[in-house]
Amino acid sequence: DYGGKVSGTTSSSGFKGAQSNQLYASESLFEGKIRREKTYTEFTENAIAADMLPLELKACESVAVTYTISIADDEKTVAVAAAKAEKKIENVYADIPALKIATDGSINETALTYFLHNVLRQTEFCARAKNYAGELIGIRDIFQQLECALLWIPDYCRGKIIEALGFIGEDGRAPRQYTYPRSKDVPPKMDLRKFIDQGVWIISTVYTYLAVTGDFSILNETCGYYKLSDDTVAYSDKRDSVLEHLIRIADFLISNLDEETDCLHALYGDWNDALDGLGKTDDKGKDYGTGVSVMATMQLYKNCNELTEILTHEKEYADKIKTYKATAARIEKGLRKYAIDENKDGDKKILHGWGDKRAYKVGCYCDNDGKSRDSATSNAFWVL
C-alpha cells in the first residue's frame, strides 16, 4: 500500500511505463510506486531518480519541495555541502515583494495573489539559475528574466547583465544561445543562427535597469567579446565598457535595416519562432533576403530612443545621438508606410512582417493562405 514516501531509481520508460508516454500519464504516478526499478540503464535510456510524496492539501494551501544535490567522494563533504546549500535555499526568495491583490470581486483575490507571487518566484528562479535541461542558455530568456527580477534583486541582476554581455560578438551580434566555457582554453558552444532580435532585448533591459536603479556606473563596467563567424566561436582580446557593447549591438541592428522599407531584416527569425523563415530567399549566393520582422523593427525603434536618452547622460556621444534620432525617424516613416495593412472597408491592423521582396505578408487581412490573422506581439510593441 502507498502510505508514505517512495524513493527509487529507474529509467524514463520504466517510470512512465512506456517511452512514448508523457509524464502526466506515467503509470508509476497512477500506481503510487515506481513501476520497474533499475539500478542501471542502457546508454540509450535516461536515468531517473524518483521520489513520490503523499500530500493532502486544503484549499489555498501549497507545498514546495526543494532538493539539494551534492556530488563528492566522501560522506563528510556531502554533509557539509548539503548544510550550506540548505542555508542558501532559505534566503533565496527573501527579496520577493509581498503581494496582496485587491479586485472588484470578479476574480478571487487569494488565487490571483498566489498566482502572481509564483510568477515572481519563477522569474527570480530563472534569473538566478541555468534553468535548462541542456547546456545552452538563451540570451533572450536571460535578459527578459533580468528585466523583471531587477525590480527586487537589482544588485544580483547587475552582475548577471555584465556577465551575459561578455558573450556578444565583436560586431555587436548576440548569439541565440551560449554555454559557460569549460576552461579558458575551450571556447563556449553557441547557437549562431542569425535571429535578428537577440540584441533588442539586451538594450531594453539595460535601459530598464538604469531607469529603476539610477545606477549609471554599470555603463563603465568592462566586459569582453567573442569572435563569431557563421559556425565557429573564438576568444577575443577586445574588452570595453557596457555602454560600448550597447552601441555595437545597436549599430549591428541598424546595419540590417532594409534600404527600401527602412524596416529590420528578419534574417533567420525573431522572437516568434513560429514565423522563422521570413528572411529566406531564392536568390543564389545570398543567405537571406529582404524579409522583415515588424515586431523587431519596433523594438529597434524603441532601442534608438532608449539609447538617445542614455547617451544624454554621457560625454562625447553627440554624433551617436544624432544617428539614433535619425534612425528612429527613418524607422517610423518606414513602419507607417509599409507595416499597416488595410482592408476594403478601411479597417487597419499591424503586420507581423513580410517575406523576401514583399512577396507575401504575415498577420494581414489576407495571408498567403487567404486567411486573416492578427499578430499580438507586433500590435503590442506598436503601443509600447
What residues fall within each predicted segment?
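Trp/Gly-enriched beta-strand surface patches
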Residues: 1-59
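Short Pro-Gly-centered flexible turn/kink motifs
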Residues: 54-73, 300-303
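Low-complexity, Ser/Thr/Pro/Gly-enriched N-terminal "stalk/linker" regions
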Residues: 75, 84-135, 156-159, 163, ...
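Extended, well-ordered alpha-helical scaffold segments
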Residues: 79-92, 107, 111, 115, ...
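Glycine- and aromatic-rich loop/turn segments at beta-sheet edges
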Residues: 120-132, 170-186, 217-220, 256-285, ...
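Solvent-exposed loop and edge beta-strand segments that line ligand/cofactor-binding
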Residues: 128-142, 185-197, 281-297, 359-384
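Aromatic-rich carbohydrate-recognition surfaces in CAZymes
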Residues: 142, 149-263, 293-297, 301
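Catalytic cores of carbohydrate-active enzymes
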Residues: 175-176, 299-384
